[in-house]
């Protein structure tokens, strides 16, 4: 059976892995998933990530914990295949009054809401992470 929303699957694997106190989670890789993982690493929500394999690449995310608790409190898919959500640069949301991040897909690549505001770009809101 084919996967309808691979990004939602990625976010669910992160959520489930942290609730089960897993060290790492694996999933099928894609360019968008690697870009999202890069943003999560830069913002300190995951330890590290790596892509392994040639024919069917696998993305492995090393999850991050602080004093035994998961760093990611909530991770929520916003734009989905059935309902895409696009925002202009002035309309970009602030997650938890700036404590969390919104992952935005822009014409210049995948970035946080703060980076998109600085660059003066709008785009598709992929997910919220707090």
UniProtKB/Swiss-Prot annotation:
What functional role does this protein have? One of the primary rRNA binding proteins, it binds directly to 16S rRNA central domain where it helps coordinate assembly of the platform of the 30S subunit.
A GO molecular function annotation here is: structural constituent of ribosome
Q: State the source organism's domain of life.
A: Bacteria
Q: Which UniProt keywords apply?
A: Ribonucleoprotein, Ribosomal protein, RNA-binding, rRNA-binding
Q: Name one GO biological process term.
A: translation
A Pfam family that this protein carries is Ribosomal_S8
A single GO CC term for this protein reads: ribosome
**Protein name, per record:** Small ribosomal subunit protein uS8
Q: What does the sequence similarity comment in the record state about its family?
A: Belongs to the universal ribosomal protein uS8 family.
Oligomeric and partner information: Part of the 30S ribosomal subunit. Contacts proteins S5 and S12.
